[in-house]
Amino acid sequence: MFADRLKHIVAKPLSWLGEHSPVTMVRLRYLARFHRLPNLKHPKDLNETILYLKLFTDTSAWTRLADKYQVRQYVTERGLADILIPLYGAWERVEDIPFGELPDRFILKANNGDGKGTNRVVDKTQMSDADWTDLKKELQRWLSLRHIGALAGEPQYSGIRPMIIAEQLLPTDVGQSSLVDYKLWCFHGEPHSFLVCSNRKENGHDTCLGCYDLDWGYHPENMVVSARYPQEPEPLPRPQCLEEMIRVARVLSDGFPEVRVDLYESQGRVWFGELTFTSLCGMMNYYTPGYLREMGERVVESLEWRV
């Protein structure tokens, strides 16, 4: 309880700083995590490259693509409407959500959320009156989050109009507590490798992580294991739709120096998750320094420095 209150107290001045001086905010947060300042003039690794891109390049296109509702139009424009998870609706007010018309099970998401505490699986058959009251309060809180990018200097979120979306709930694989999330790192339109999240906890934060190449070779040596980000005891099975995932990622990432294309595999099909431009705010601590440098080099070769 005290930790939550402290976070709330600290968040306000930090949010103000993030809105008015995002470079200072980023430097301070990076220093707190890595005990050194980032090289923003000549980035050397993927973290520093992401920080550079979000602070010093045109990110106006990111806003539509970071919006979980608006990005659906982009996916359709790229000829991939068939990989969109069926949508039940999108609403700007909680009172407008027709819960009685929705199926027994579905998932709710904040269109401007990062998935950590801003999505909720709903099973109407298990909901009490108190549960419905709590759910509506939670959704109202999501809609009140209008400056979520300020704390990390992420400009793409400031222009998103908050909404609640409801989607079909995809079935999970046997032995998994959540859908396996296949995240493809793409640099200048070319897929590079997979970051795979499995057995994600309900809090949205704790998850098993794995690094795989495009041939599904497993590379635990590229990861830093922690209590929050453990590794699976064994490599995950090769996805049935591996080649299709790579094709989809290539199509969706075309034209961007760096983006992570997040996909699911369910019922023998590829499904779109989201596009992520600022993974962990550009402060990833689950990759080794060497692997971060290797990935960063794929991006920086073709960038024009402006700092």
Model-identified regions with their sequence ranges:
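C-terminal active-site "lid" helix and adjoining low-complexity regulatory extension at the edge
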Residues: 23, 247, 265-307
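Short, surface-exposed beta-strand-loop junctions and turns on beta-sheet-rich folds
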Residues: 114, 200-202, 278-280
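A short, polar/proline- and glycine-enriched secondary-structure boundary/capping micro-motif
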Residues: 119, 203-212, 282-286
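A long amphipathic alpha-helix within ATP-dependent nucleotide-binding catalytic cores
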Residues: 154-168, 208-270
